[in-house]
Each structure stands twice: as structure tokens, then as C-alpha cells.
Amino acid sequence: MTYTALVYEDPETPGTWIAEFPAIPEAHSFGRTPEEALAHAKEALELVLAYLKETGRPLPPDVRTVQVGIDAA
């Protein structure tokens, strides 16, 4: 099973990276590097998915991503 992750530097705290899963908003984390943030977020994702399974709730489908181009002003 795979989920799309967003990993980006926190604009309010330079040097802090955030990782989150749009399909599972409860699963997110941060770290000093993109890799560290993603590793922590993956742990959170596994915990959330285990909880959903244990409580008989359906697992959310992943999101669909698209890139949108615009003319820079």
C-alpha cells in the first residue's frame, strides 16, 4: 500500500522540514532533514492505519496529484 507524501521546508521555521500525507491528515511529522521528517511521518502513518484497521474503519484511498502550470506574472 502506498500513499502520496508532501515534504517541504517549513516557511516559518527555516531548517525544519514537514512531511504529511494529504489522504491521512492525522499522519504528519517534522524533522531537521527531509529524510528525517519522512521517516517520522511514515511511522505516524503506520500507527494511524493500524488504528483504523483495529477499529474496523476503512482505509482512505490515496489522493490523485496533478501539476498545474501557470504563466508567471
What are these regions (language model features)?
Residues M1-L6, A39-A73:
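Short, charged, surface-exposed hinge/linker loops at domain edges
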Residues E9-I24:
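Short aromatic-glycine-(Arg/Gly/Cys) micro-motifs in beta-strand/loop hairpins
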Residues T13, S29, E54:
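Short glycine/serine/threonine-biased micro-segments
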Residues T16, R32, R57:
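Gly/Ser/Thr-rich helix-start
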Residues E20, E36, E43:
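Acidic-residue sensor for enzyme active/binding pockets
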Residues P22, H28, R57:
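Flexible, active-site-adjacent loop/turn segments at secondary-structure boundaries
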Residues P25-E36:
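A short, exposed loop/beta-hairpin motif centered on an aromatic-Gly-Thr core
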